[in-house]
Amino acid sequence: MANLKGLMKDTAIYGLSSIVGRFLNYLLVPLYTHYMPKASGDYGVSTNVYAYTALILVLLTFGMETTLFRFANDDRLTPEIGRKHSDTVFSTVMAVVGTLTVVFLLLVFGFIGPISNTLGYAAHPEYLQMMAAVVAMDALQAIPFSYLRYQKRAIRFASLKLLFIALNIGLNVFYFVVLGKTSVYYVFFINLLCTGFISLLFIPDLLKVHWHFDGQMLKRMLSYSWPILILGIAGILNQVADKILFPLVYPDQAQANVELGIYGSCVKIAMIMAMITQAFRYAYEPIVFAKSKDADKTEYYASAMKYFLIFTLLAFLCVVGWMPLLQYIIGEEYREGLGVVPIVMAAEIMMGVYFNLSFWYKLIDKTIYGAWFSLAGCLVLFAVNIIFIPKYGYWACAWGGVAGYGTAMVLSYMVGQKKNPIPYPMRSIAYYVALTVMLTLTMNYVPATYHFGSVVTLIFNSLCICCFVSYILQSDLPLSSLPIIGKYFRKK
């Protein structure tokens, strides 16, 4: 329980930078959807370009974030030697990412003409140049950020993340509201400024590192990381392939960016699941490797999975139930796509479960399994998108995510229970999923059938959510076990 409380504490701190940060970034969605007219397709351009940058970031980091945790954790070393060892791991990882980043920048700036023509940005190659610089700096920042997580410096981590977000929001408000800009150019330009500033703030941390490159360690790292790279590529394609493929396969090319803008803006509401999963990952990943030698590790992993699902399902219900209010996050022109939000959220939950399941092969250094699972899910997603986007548009994108993540999740669970079984509480998990489905149907059916107004709908849906919370408190999380307020409910 102490370890789980520590996990919850770290998740809360990382969540400050992830969940609160993303929530603050929601302020940019109404900003963009108000100042960028739907007909311009500029929001679709932003969605498309950021999809490419997400994929490139995975390529440049080369699975080295997880590799850093795997190689830096060594309980046999004394604290002093352990620090030198972890610095050597960090140095070697940075050498890999730095080399890949330099090669990437040389290729982009050397062949910007053909690249911009191929991707449909011949008129605006500067979009790609700015975002190439952004993703290069993001890749170089990713390893120091991971090192902060390894060192359990959660406050420093969260502070830098939140500073970036504050700068980004402030500059966007200045350019779009004060100066009245309407072009997507300024979205990329502001990102470049903010990313560059945060990169400079890492200089003091980098100066404290005892730099030492280990060639022998690098060989073992690459052997460990390349399946993670494949896993990462397949995983990120599951997240962004729809946004990359959409302009390529949608029959009306002139309308493609408009439709993609609608989908991209509505997906922002569903991204609360990505926030929770990311915050949980930041806290959980270092702990998993550190706890891998403990006798109670399987029980811990099973409990972590259960509580992850409980809170993501609660978040799902909150978003679905409070949609009459949350819809105002995006501009009125873009709200026609709100129906995809629950579908995308379900896909994100599956992705989170898949992430939790993935540790069985990481802990036994069989990361190749993850590569195969993610590749299978990616192929399913590609097939659904390519076949159905021409007919069903962005609805195919949403269901493609469910199909892709669902495939990877099921494969990982089935193989994992044979190779490295973990006693997940499947009956309890099934109850929570069934209750979530029932309450979701109730919140959609009853207000629509009886023509509730927005206020009455919010009250009714909130009562449904309270039913779910009541079940949690009764079954798995009694008030007496909660931090801070728990002491008031414990028996004397």
Language-model-derived ranges and their functions:
Residues Y26-D42, S116-T118, I233-I272, A290, ...:
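Helix-terminus/linker motif at the lipid-water interface of multi-pass membrane proteins
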Residues N73-A95, I262-S374:
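Specific pore-lining/lateral-gate transmembrane helices of multi-pass inner-membrane transport
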Residues M137-L160, Y185, M345-A376, G416-K418:
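Membrane-interface junctions at transmembrane-helix termini in multi-pass inner-membrane proteins
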Residues N3-T66, V102-G110, V134, I165-I169, ...:
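Signature of the first transmembrane helix
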